[in-house]
Amino acid sequence: YRVPPGFSTTRLSLVDRGMIYAIAHVRGGDDMGRAWYLAGKTTERKNTFNDFIDVAKGLIARNYTAAGRISVEGRSAGGQVMGVIYNEAPELWGAVLAGVPFVDVINTMVDETLPLTPGEWPEWGNPITDKAAFDYMLSYSPYDHVTAKAYPPMLVSAGLNDPRVTYW
């Protein structure tokens, strides 16, 4: 999972208007090699979320932006990151875009009838056979951590025919 490098006229247009554009290369992505990827999977998954929040705090500390003025976007597993950071540090974000987000981690990963669930167990862990994996997933699952508090605006999109992230 990563944002491929490349030129984007959309990004250039944002920068020309005074916006700052940053990409967070968090653990769990393959941008920095296999060890970096492994440091963000299964029982190390929280590193991904912490890294993302740390990047935002670093941008704030260096006066590139301020808390509440950062817009973020992620899709699928990146949408899961959006869900976690939304719950963990809502004060940092001005807006959150989550495309087909994987936010109901527990119900998805315990339903082995879903076509992709068994194949994802090596990446996330198997909560059916491993209580520690279940507890770890539950500790960050965005769906299971929504509380009554102030949240920034969020746009969520779903795919009617997405086999990885169901729309319900």
Language model: regions and residue ranges:
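Short, surface-exposed "cap/lid" segments of acyl-processing enzymes
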Residues: Y1-T9
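Active-site-proximal cap/loop segments of hydrolase catalytic domains
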Residues: S8-R17, I23-W168
